[in-house]
């Protein structure tokens, strides 16, 4: 085997080992990102919602910093309601389509439909309100008490 081929094979193996250490997003959260993209017509990168205000991202506490953050709080509460119904919202995959007016749910089971409705309402809410860069990556221990 040629040395160049060995180097290429080594590079592929090393990159695969590195990638295996990155935890995957729960399936539904990856799907939620696509629903958001449908609702806002791709205006904002999905990562903008992963660390915004007091509620957009993992956890959440305090008073939402603005209407966009309130969308995330409402979404968290909707997921909590889904869990009370026995659903697993961060793992539940559902069926939806992206129409000219935004995303629409067409799931059959109760859990799929409930989780899809949570995501579509949040995505539509995100699309309605402005994004304030000052509320990205804030100090939550100070601003979200």
Curated annotation (Swiss-Prot):
Q: What is this protein called?
A: Basic phospholipase A2 PC10
Location of this chain's protein in the cell: Secreted
One Pfam family, please name it: Phospholip_A2_1
What keywords are assigned to this protein?
Calcium, Disulfide bond, Hydrolase, Lipid degradation, Lipid metabolism, Metal-binding, Secreted, Signal
In its keyword annotation, does this UniProt entry include Transport? no
Alphabetized GO MF terms: calcium ion binding; calcium-dependent phospholipase A2 activity; phospholipid binding
EC assignment: the record states: 3.1.1.4
Q: What is its main location?
A: secreted
What InterPro entries does the record point to? Answer: PLipase_A2, PLipase_A2_Asp_AS, PLipase_A2_dom, PLipase_A2_dom_sf, PLipase_A2_His_AS
Query: What class does this enzyme belong to in the EC scheme?
Result: hydrolase
